[in-house]
Amino acid sequence: HLKNIAKKRVFNIHIQDPKVDLNHFDFIVAPEHDSLIGQNVISTKGAIHYLTENEIIENKDYLKSFIKNDERKIWTLIMGGPTRYYDYSTKNMKHIFTSLYKLLKKHDFQLVVIPSMRTPINSIHYAKEFFGDNHTVIMKVDKKAYLSALALAENIIVTCDSSSMISEAALTGKPIYIAGILPKKNDKRFQRFRNLFRELN
């Protein structure tokens, strides 16, 4: 509305898919997997986020008093939360945790589990119960712990429900693995995103 009134005095940039006619904006900056097409569309490879490499480096030592002080290298699991597409049922969490535990045991890695704002409290407690005292589960949302876990990790695993957290993990340049959950309905948009990252290696 303001754009229509002020005409050229307002330069209008929208971040992500506006879900309305693209011609209402001077520019739209949106992830490539949103499949927006137009002369005023600027596409990004991943989801747009605010993390910087400096932030990650500056917080590297934050978790050193939390994690187990041994020779094992660290794998970090970043957990999202339930969405319209993915369910965080005990069955789905058990499948992820069991697959991950086998890898940890085989390669003798230490796991650090980081929850997000969307992670159900029962999923956090289940992770603590499942992995026990030999690994580290951060029990509450803690941005510094998140940044530190990204910095310390040899490998990063992110649940499939969050394009943003996958994009943030990619900032580290480290190997990223996706913890898959069977979708409740067609998740082709998320699949496009993951396929794009796979092609980028």
Regions flagged by a language model, labelled:
Residues 12-16, 31, 179-180:
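Short beta-strand elements of ligand-binding domains
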Residues 194-201:
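Leloir-type glycosyltransferase catalytic cores
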Residues 73, 82-114:
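Conserved catalytic-core segment of nucleotide-activated headgroup transferases in glycan assembly
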Residues 21-22, 37, 85-86, 119-125, ...:
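Short, charged/polar "capping" segments at the starts of alpha-helices
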Residues 146-187:
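A donor-sugar binding/catalytic signature common to diverse glycosyltransferases
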